[in-house]
Amino acid sequence: MIVPWQGLSPDTLDNLIESFVLREGTDYGEHERSLEQKVADVKRQLQSGEAVLVWSELHETVNIMPKKQFRD
């Protein structure tokens, strides 16, 4: 189920994004990006609709994923 990220408090949203970024592992690109940069990137993706915040009833977890990969 998609959760409207706009309904979350800014602190809650930042904490969810930070947790997601930290779970994602190591960057293998040419330039290392800071945690703040990664959080800002994910926030931009949510704002643009490219990514969505998803609640899994089965696992009782929240995740962020590309909208094109989300299936009801």
UniProtKB/Swiss-Prot annotation:
Please name the Pfam families in this protein's record: UPF0270
Entry-linked SUPFAM superfamilies: YehU-like (SSF118001)
So which domain of life are we looking at? Answer: Bacteria
InterPro entries linked: UPF0270, YehU-like_sf
Q: Which family does it belong to?
A: Belongs to the UPF0270 family.
Supply the name of the protein: UPF0270 protein YheU
Q: What is the lineage of its organism?
A: Bacteria, Pseudomonadati, Pseudomonadota, Gammaproteobacteria, Enterobacterales
Gene name, per UniProt, is yheU
